[in-house]
Regions:
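Catalytic-core regions of core metabolic enzymes
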Residues: 1-539
């Protein structure tokens, strides 16, 4: 149905007591103008009725278990969905189809697939919420360009965390170019990425940067084992492969701690020329005596204190002569450690990999991808067991704050009313005033220009430190004013603030803003001249 006729169709649907409508049509908010008006009208109809709408500008959905496929994606023709406990929620129909297709090729069963498009009504947050509440869903993959209802989105992520269901999230629009593309695609305003990053982390979802990583992590959740620690054990037949994985583990914040000395001695007794530290190298003796594999792994799990193990077997596991004996050895090794996660990095045929999977052993070819997937499982283990601290919200103070840019002195006075004590100075409006307040102190003074038009004082020469005498203070006062007039001639100057120097400690920056999506947020990080250079801040 063309966009200009959709509103009439939706109105007719309401008259016939329809409960849901799926709108494939494009030509709405994503093109602006008249399309935006059409979409607003659809939203109004939903608000005034019991109708729920998916879309417009979406590719539909499916339920593989009930074989319900209201979608026009061509992927269904090429790959009939395999029912499973993984589901997909995507704002983009085409990219949602891409995620489904590569999932199918990976052998992952997808139960529900939902694309939300422009979200005149149903949002991706609501879709995640529905999936999190469904007992038939264990893992959720989500593609998000923007969030319109921050509270709803947070509640969905929190529901999934409480249910111990991994949410693997691809949030795009990180760059200015990407954000602009998102806006033209589904009329999405991407928002400040640093805030999204913190929301995702704080509420237990795992953010990925690629489809490959998304699929790897979803695949790794199949055993439903989420370690609560970050200690990684590596067993390998290749010293080089072990080094590669150790580096990758360091990159993602995992610990590759050495085996205890007693355990190392026992490993040496089994294979004198083995490397018993961690990575544990079983060497080529592996080919002659596979019984060393369960012995090594047992020592690693019983004495090494590792929360998960990755085994690097390269193409050996794919050998017809070695694949089954190795699998038998791994089954023996893990028979007493069903609560531990073990990931194989190996190169083998699809049949061999599936055979290993049926026995509960994951297989990821690239060892660094195996490490990243293990890190994701450990991340979920940490988040699923994280205690949520309840914050006592104080009633707001009734303070009259002027609706204009405030200078530094005014800001300090307001913050003091909230019991935030800062290094308050004196405002000087002429050089003669310095004599009235200057006293010799050990650490000296700092002088700063005060202007609501100047955010970064260093850039305009508006600050001077370590002032140790009255004459120097008078000289610096004149220098600061001259610097500012030269470099920022249009700035309105309220004066110069003089404060005692404070040495030692760490200079920090603290800020607050009302985000249009998530509401009030607080920013904290490294302050001073390093704020813009290092950008070491968190929300």
């Amino acid at each position: 149905v063309p966009a200009k006729f959709v509103v009439n169709v939706i109105e007719d649907a309401v008259k016939k007591n329809a409960r849901t409508a799926l709108i494939f049509s494009s030509g709405f908010s994503e093109i602006g103008g008249e399309g935006k008006v059409y979409q607003k009208k659809i939203r109004e109809i939903c608000d005034q009725s019991n109708l729920r709408v998916i879309g417009p500008n979406c590719l539909g959905l499916f339920n593989s278990q009930s074989r319900f496929y209201p979608t026009f994606t061509s992927t269904i023709d090429r790959a009939t969905p395999i029912p499973g406990d993984i589901s997909i929620a995507s704002q983009s129909g085409a990219y949602g189809s891409h995620i489904y297709m590569v999932s199918h090729q990976r052998g992952l069963g997808i139960r529900y697939w939902i694309t939300t498009g422009n979200e005149a009504d149903l949002s991706v947050g609501e879709a995640i919420q529905l999936l999190a509440e469904d007992d038939n869903v264990h893992t959720i993959m989500a593609y998000v360009e923007s969030v319109k209802n921050g509270k709803q989105f947070i509640n969905a992520l929190e529901t999934a965390r409480q249910e111990k269901k991994p949410v693997i999230l691809m949030k795009v629009g990180r760059s200015d170019v990407g954000a602009a593309a998102a806006n033209s695609h589904t009329a999405s305003l991407a928002g400040e990425d640093a805030i999204y990053e913190e929301v995702v982390r704080a509420h237990g979802a795992y953010r990925v940067r690629s489809t490959e990583e998304m699929l790897d992590v979803a695949y790794a959740t199949k055993p439903k084992i989420y370690p609560t620690g970050k200690n990684l054990g590596i067993v390998t037949i290749s010293g080089g492969g072990g080094v590669l994985m150790a580096d990758a583990a360091s990159d993602v914040g995992l610990k590759v701690g050495a085996m205890p000395e007693g355990a190392q001695k026992e490993l040496k007794e089994i294979v004198p020329f083995a490397s018993p530290m961690n990575p544990v190298d079983v060497t080529a003796q592996f080919f002659n005596d596979l019984s060393i594999v369960p012995k090594f792994i047992d020592l690693m799990l019983s004495q090494g204190g590792y929360d998960g193990i990755i085994g690097f077997w390269t193409s050996v596991a794919g050998s017809p002569k070695m694949s089954q004996p190795l699998l038998n050895a791994l089954k023996e090794a893990m028979s007493n450690y069903s609560e531990k996660i073990f990931i194989n990095s190996m190169v083998a045929s699809e049949d061999i990999v599936k055979h290993y999977e049926k026995e509960g052993f994951l297989s990821i070819e690239d060892p660094t991808r195996a490490v990243v997937s293990m890190a994701a499982l450990m991340y979920f283990g940490e988040k699923f067991n994280e205690k949520i601290e309840k914050i006592e919200i104080q009633p707001p103070l009734k303070i009259n704050i002027p609706k204009r840019n405030l200078n530094e002195i005014e800001c300090v006075e307001i913050l003091e009313k909230f019991d935030i004590n800062l290094n308050k100075g004196k405002l000087i409006k002429n050089v003669q005033e310095i004599k009235n307040i200057y006293k010799d102190i050990e650490d000296g003074y700092v002088m700063k220009v005060v202007s609501k038009d100047i955010q970064h004082k260093t850039e305009v020469g508006g600050i001077s430190i370590n002032i140790k005498s009255l004459i120097e203070a008078e000289t610096k006062y004149d220098e600061i004013l001259q610097n500012v007039k030269t470099k920022s001639p249009k700035a309105l100057i309220d004066g110069v603030m003089i404060s005692p120097m404070i040495k030692g400690g760490v200079e920090a920056i603290l800020g607050a803003k009302v985000d249009p999506v998530f509401g009030p947020v607080v920013m904290f990080g490294l302050g001073g001249i390093y704020t813009e250079v290092l950008k070491d801040i968190s929300f």
